[in-house]
Amino acid sequence: MTQPLLLASTSPFRKVLLDKFQYPFETANPNTDESSFSGESAEALVQRLAEQKAKACGNNYPEHLIIGSDQVCVINGKIIGKPHTVENACLQLKAASGQIVTFYTGLCLYNAKTGQSDVICEPFHVHFRQLTEQEIERYIEREMPLYCAGSFMCEGLGIALFNKLEGRDPNTLIGLPLIALREMLEKQGISIL
């Protein structure tokens, strides 16, 4: 019998992505501290947090394969998180205007039964077009992306902010690299097809 699957996330976007596999899973809140360490790279941060989230659910789900994921964006070498306020969202989008912004998504598949983790970092590049202040304000007013790294939702109106998207898996930008996850699940004996 295959192990049950758990998504260690309360994100409705990650849940919708994982639903694409048409494979049964549960969700749980990992309830972890997402602070970065001094000098920690974006890649190291998202991998550490993805694994931390997955392992945080291990005690309550000791028989499960647990999926953890975390994402940050980097603008001009600086790690940018969720804006939380309209003012911060405006600042983030002004900084992104005309730039190539890299999103790093950490993915962990933790086998709570064996204690083994498979952890990766998937980059994704977003080429922003030049944005006017009015476009930024209208976008934020219409979509309110205050809990999204980088202050946009590409699955919605955010697509109008870009010239080009570049990466292995477009799902990565929304927060869950499904191509990499399928590969990890296959190593654990779970076939999606």
UniProtKB/Swiss-Prot annotation:
Chemical reaction(s) catalysed: N(7)-methyl-GTP + H2O = N(7)-methyl-GMP + diphosphate + H(+)
Listed EC numbers: 3.6.1.-
Alphabetized GO MF terms: nucleoside triphosphate diphosphatase activity
Annotated transmembrane regions: none
Entry keyword set: Cytoplasm, Hydrolase, Nucleotide metabolism
Active-site residues annotated for this sequence: 70
Marked site (Important for substrate specificity) residue numbers: 13, 71, 155
Compartments (UniProt record): Cytoplasm
GO biological process, one term: nucleotide metabolic process
EC class (word): hydrolase
GO CC field: cytoplasm
InterPro entries per UniProt: ITPase-like_fam (IPR029001), Maf-like (IPR003697)
Cofactor(s) needed by this chain: a divalent metal cation
Entry function: Nucleoside triphosphate pyrophosphatase that hydrolyzes 7-methyl-GTP (m(7)GTP). May have a dual role in cell division arrest and in preventing the incorporation of modified nucleotides into cellular nucleic acids.
Family listed: Belongs to the Maf family. YceF subfamily.
Protein's UniProt name: 7-methyl-GTP pyrophosphatase
Organism: Photobacterium profundum (strain SS9)
